[in-house]
A protein has these predicted regions:
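Histidine-dependent nucleotide/RNA phosphoesterase domain, centered on the 2H-phosphoesterase fold
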Residues: 1-170
Length: 170
């Protein structure tokens, strides 16, 4: 009997080709930008990952793309498959413009203690707010975008460090 639990999540093929190079991927994910110093430190962590286990990962993420994911509104590997939804989401976000602008320049302080496997597609740095006040601010902002499109999975603040090798254990 063959088991598939070591084969990884097949959804990785939406973002990573058979050659382990990133494919085009379209969407309107809501993200927080990171300071350059944070991106530099993350790049050091990623370097250690690739030195320690290069066979585990696909092409490296470029450090300037590191970000904190707040909400994945819509995404797909083919633009025409998601274009209408992107447009509809944009209209809904425009309707919430004033609410969003109230929080636009605020900084939400976060911490991290560990790296973990995110749905068997990637290795991520798990984040959490430093206190209850920051938690409330984060969840208020998340809830605002969740009214644009409700997600079917729990909110997990994170920074993606590396995507797994698409062909591992194939």
């Amino acid at each position: 009997m063959e088991t598939n639990f070591l084969r990884g999540n097949p959804s990785i093929s939406q973002k990573v080709g058979k050659d382990n190079v990133f494919r085009n991927f379209y969407g309107d994910t809501i993200v927080f930008a990171l300071d350059d110093i944070v991106k530099e430190k993350l790049a050091e962590y990623v370097e250690l990952l690739y030195q320690s286990a290069p066979e585990c990962f696909c092409e490296r993420l470029v450090p300037h793309t590191f970000h904190v994911t707040l909400h994945d509104l819509s995404n797909a590997p083919v633009l025409r498959d998601v274009a209408e939804e992107l447009f509809e989401n944009e209209l809904k976000v425009i309707e919430k413009r004033e609410e969003i602008q109230k929080q636009e320049n605020e900084i939400i302080k976060m911490k991290s203690k560990y790296i973990f496997n995110m749905v068997d597609t990637s290795l991520v740095l798990r984040l959490y707010p430093v206190d209850e006040g920051e938690y409330r601010r984060l969840m208020d902002l998340y809830s605002l975008f969740d009214t644009v499109k409700k997600l079917s999975y729990p909110f997990t603040p994170h920074i993606t460090l590396a995507h797994y090798d698409r062909n591992r254990n194939a």
